Amino acid sequence: MAKSKNHTTHNQSRKWHRNGIKKPRSQRYESLKGVDPKFLRNMRFAKKHNKKGLKKMQANNAKAMSARAEAIKALVKPKEVKPNIPKGGSRKLSRLAYIAHPKLGKRARARIAKGLRFCRPKSQAKAQSKAKATAGGTAAAPVPPASAPKGAQAPTKAPQ
């Protein structure tokens, strides 16, 4: 009778290594960085078997983490707080550079020009110029003398 081929050992190691040898779960994900690998393993088993020890284990781990944080706080000296200086000038320069750029600034320049066109109130500007003209006409303003031909002397006052 021929041997059953259900349980083969052929190419098994290749299958295992196809995805590479994986890192521990604590190093695999950014969110699990610094978490005890033993704790993660226990969590897996606890999820698998739904044990009551899960809550106790979590409480113990939380205590350990808080103790660790306190120890780190005690060891690390507090740094001097530097005053935060706002970076206003660099933003202004970068904006100007963007506007001056031949391709990128095309739309920005168009928007600025459009804004200037729309924001300038034409009726107010005309009204202000008219008001200045009327105010200047009523007040006694010195009228400039008629221009003399080029090279002519200015007229002198006659003695009385």
Swiss-Prot record:
Alphabetized Pfam families for the sequence: Ribosomal_L29e
From the Swiss-Prot or TrEMBL record, what is one GO molecular function term?
structural constituent of ribosome
Keywords of this entry: Acetylation, Cytoplasm, Methylation, Phosphoprotein, Ribonucleoprotein, Ribosomal protein
Give start-end positions of Basic residues composition bias.
1-26
Subcellular location(s) of the protein: Cytoplasm
Question: Alphabetically, which GO biological process terms does the record hold?
Answer: cytoplasmic translation
Is Zinc given among the entry's keywords? no
The transmembrane segments are none
Q: Does the UniProt entry include the keyword Acetylation?
A: yes
Residues carrying Phosphoserine = S31
Bias category Low complexity: which stretches? 121-141
What are the record's GO terms for cellular component?
cytoplasmic side of rough endoplasmic reticulum membrane; cytosolic large ribosomal subunit; large ribosomal subunit
Sites of the modification N6-acetyllysine?
K33
Question: What family is it from?
Answer: Belongs to the eukaryotic ribosomal protein eL29 family.
Function, as annotated: Component of the large ribosomal subunit. The ribosome is a large ribonucleoprotein complex responsible for the synthesis of proteins in the cell.
Q: What is this protein called?
A: Large ribosomal subunit protein eL29
Q: Which organism is it from?
A: Sus scrofa (Pig)
